[in-house]
Every structure is written in structure tokens, then in C-alpha cells.
């Protein structure tokens, strides 16, 4: 069995796609940061290793993060270059602008789905979160055909609600669903 993906074409069920977050998540480690040239060299090394998807950064986080994602999108060939964004329209637009020049691009958008996060972090009701899922994926699709959606704090989410969120993301056009075991 296989399926068709906008950035990978027809994919066999046994194909493992390597998704690397070093440039985004690795930068959150205390005492570890890279300048622009180091980030580009790291992205080029990941491409040389055969990494399929590089999450290059969180473009809305800072002008420096935007610039590094943009430069990686312009220079690194081969892997899908991804910009991370919350479900906020400004985040998604900024990510879309940052990855514009990539030969293969993706926006990875997320929102918290657990009762705890919805109540205290987002201050949203579940139906509002579902609306954000749909709207965020729909907006991201205006910048790229390849959109990844993630449920932040998904492991503490009611399974029925999580399935509704996944269904909403797929219906809105998400091509990759990410259900992590840890927080983003």
C-alpha cells in the first residue's frame, strides 16, 4: 500500500521519513545557540546526511529566527524546509514568508489540545480550538501544499477530542499529522 504526498510523491508504507528539529528545538537547550552561518552549515550537513525534513526554526520568534529560516530556504536544496508556527494568523504568515524560496517547503502549525492547556494556556473552549485547527491549516495551505499539524500536549488530550482535531486538520488540507509524546 502507498499514498501520495505533495513533497514526496508516492510513498510506500514502509518508507521512514526523517524529520529533524535540531535547528529549532536544539536551540532551546541552555548554552547552545548558533549564528546564521552555523545554522546554514548545520542544515547543509543534515541535507548531506539524507534528512528528509528540516524544521529550520520558528520564524515569528525573532528577526534572527526569521532570517535563518529564510536563508536556509534559499540555500539548502533537497530536504523539505519547514517553518514552525502557532495557529495564529501572524505566525503562519511569517512562516510562509520565511519558507517562500524553498524548493520543497512546509508549514508546521500547532495548537494545544489538552483540557489543561485549553483552559489555562489558551483560555479557549474545545470548539474554539477546533475552529483554530481548521483556520490555521487552511491559511497555511495558501503558502504551501505541504502542511503539518500537531496537537501540543496531545498525550493528555481526551482521545475523542484529539480524533476530532486530527479529522479537522485533514479536512482542512493537512498532509502530515504529528502526535508527539512530548510537548513542542
Region annotations inferred by a language model:
Residues 65-73, 92-98, 157-169:
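Distinct, well-ordered alpha-helical segments
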Residues 1-89:
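N-terminal capping/small domains of soluble enzymes
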Residues 79-147, 155-161:
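Active-site beta->alpha loop and helix N-cap motifs at the rims of alpha/beta catalytic domains
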Residues 2-10, 91-102, 167:
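Short amphipathic alpha-helices and their capping/turn segments at secondary-structure boundaries
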Residues 182-184:
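Conserved small/polar residues in nucleotide/adenosyl-binding loops
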Residues 26, 46, 107, 149, ...:
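Conserved, mostly hydrophobic/aromatic
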Amino acid at each position: 500500500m502507498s499514498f501520495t504526498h505533495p513533497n514526496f510523491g508516492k510513498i510506500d508504507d514502509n518508507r521512514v521519513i526523517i524529520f529533524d528539529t535540531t535547528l529549532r528545538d536544539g536551540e532551546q537547550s541552555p548554552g547552545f545557540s548558533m549564528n546564521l552561518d552555523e545554522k546554514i552549515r548545520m542544515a547543509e550537513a543534515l541535507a548531506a546526511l539524507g534528512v528528509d525534513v528540516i524544521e529550520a526554526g520558528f520564524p515569528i520568534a525573532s528577526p534572527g529566527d526569521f532570517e535563518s529560516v529564510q536563508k536556509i530556504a534559499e540555500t539548502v536544496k533537497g530536504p523539505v524546509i519547514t517553518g514552525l508556527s502557532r495557529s495564529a494568523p501572524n505566525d503562519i504568515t511569517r512562516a510562509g514568508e520565511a519558507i517562500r524560496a524553498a524548493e520543497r517547503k512546509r508549514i508546521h502549525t500547532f495548537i494545544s489540545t489538552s483540557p489543561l492547556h485549553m483552559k489555562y494556556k489558551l483560555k479557549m473552549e474545545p470548539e474554539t480550538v477546533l475552529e483554530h485547527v481548521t483556520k490555521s491549516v487552511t491559511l497555511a495551505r495558501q503558502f504551501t501544499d505541504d502542511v503539518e499539524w500537531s496537537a501540543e500536549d496531545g498525550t493528555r488530550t481526551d482521545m475523542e477530542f484529539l480524533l476530532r482535531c486530527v479529522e479537522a486538520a485533514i479536512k482542512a488540507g493537512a498532509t502530515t499529522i504529528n502526535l508527539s509524546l512530548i510537548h513542542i
